[in-house]
Amino acid sequence: MVKLRPGDTAPGFSLDSVNMGRVTLGEYRGRRVLLVFGRYFGCPVCQYDFDQLIKFSGETGIDVIYMVQSRPESAAEYIGGLGVDFPVVAVPVENGRYRVYDAYGVGALGAASVIQMFRRARDARRAGKVHGPYEGRETQSPADFVVDVDGVILRAHVGLFDPVELTAFLRDLG
């Protein structure tokens, strides 16, 4: 699995979302897009970060595509009623692999992410998030990528979603 870096071309994909039909990265050419790779919606940390992403999306106006390793039914049930205005893709498993995660080099949690995950779990519990069904890879790292108008990766971040850091990055881009 190759880790993507800024300057690399974002791998294309065309996948069904659970809320907005087919999502094809190439159709976002001409617009900046944020690709977010989550774990699964049963994960309290992922629930907490997803709430932050909804708020972030509304505040920044950047196009968002959210990838998750939950089953389509679980993903649709979780986001129902949340007012999600971006596509949520329940990534299909093919021969035991999540191909789009592999294409973007999003693998297992590193040691730093595990420590962050425990800290964030405390915040998630305080926010009332509870663990649901296990789906996907339990050791999966989250990640996010900012892709420019020409399909080139501007930011490649493997780890927990950080809206403050991402907002600063987008502000610096202008």
Explain the meaning of each model-derived region.
Residues 94-161:
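Thiol/selenol-based redox catalytic cores and closely related redox-interacting motifs
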Residues 1-25:
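N-terminal "domain-start" segment that seeds a small globular fold
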Residues 24-53, 63:
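Short active-site neighborhood of thiol/selenol oxidoreductases, capturing the structured segment around
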Residues 38, 68, 148:
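Short beta-strand/turn micro-motifs composed of small residues
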